[in-house]
Amino acid sequence: MLPEHQELLGRLTRQRLNIELSGDQIEKFSIYADRLVEWNEKVNLTSITEPEEIILKHFVDSLALLSLVQGKRLADIGTGAGFPGIPLKILLPEVEVYLVDSLAKRLDFLETVIKELKLTKVQTVHARAEDFARDPHYRETFDCVTSRAVARLPVLLEYAVPLLKKGGYFLAAKGSQAQEEVMESKKALTVLGAEIKDIKLFNLGAEAEHRAIILVEKTSSTPPAYPRKAGTPGKKPLV
C-alpha cells in the first residue's frame, strides 16, 4: 500500500473502531494488501481490489470483531483470503488461530502471507467445515469461531457450534439481513445447543452497507450427529 493508504487504514481503525494500530501492524496490513492484489490475478480471492475498498471492506470490517474475541483458540471457517482470521491474528499474536477453507489455492496464498508477515501460532486447514467440525482433534476445542462466509446463519451454526467449547462464542459477521437470519435459526440453535447473546450493529461508512455481528454462545454439548455429512447443512438447513 502507498503511504496515503497506510494513513487511511490507521485513521479509519481509530475513528470507526477506536483501535490504534502500531507502525508494525500497519506495515503487516500493507504487505497483506499488496499480496492479495498480486495473487488475485491468478487465484480468485476477492472482487475487492482497490486499496481504499480493501481497507474498509476487508480490514476494518474484519477488525470490527476484535473486541468480541475471547479465549486463546480461534477457528475462522470459510476463511477465503483470510478474513477475518488474518486481521484478527495481526492484532492478537497470543491467540492460536486456525484458518479453515476447502480450496487449496486459497490456503497456498495464506501460507505465503503467514510466512512473510512472520505470524506464529496460526495454521491453515484444508477441509470442508463439516469434516473439520467432526474431527475429534478439533471438535469442542475452540473458545471462539468466526465467519464472514456467505451461507445463511442456520447453515453457519451447524458448521461453527460443534467446534466450540461450552461457553465459547461464535461471531458471525453479517449484513443488514442479520435479524431475519436470526429468526430463521431457532431450530438450529435448539438442536445444536446454543443461543443468541447479542446482535452488534455498525456501519463502515456513509455509502457502505449496514453490518452486524451476531454473537452466539454455546450452552450445551452438541449431539454427535452434527454437523451432518459435507453438503447436507447447505442443502437441508436446520430451519
Curated annotation (Swiss-Prot):
Its source organism is: Desulfitobacterium hafniense (strain Y51)
Task: Check the record and name the Pfam families matching this protein.
Answer: GidB
Q: Does the keyword rRNA processing apply?
A: yes
One MF term in the entry's GO annotations: rRNA (guanine-N7-)-methyltransferase activity
Q: Which family does it belong to?
A: Belongs to the methyltransferase superfamily. RNA methyltransferase RsmG family.
Q: Where in the cell is it found?
A: Cytoplasm
The protein's name is Ribosomal RNA small subunit methyltransferase G
Give the residue range of the signal peptide.
none
Described by its record, this protein's role is as follows:
Specifically methylates the N7 position of a guanine in 16S rRNA.
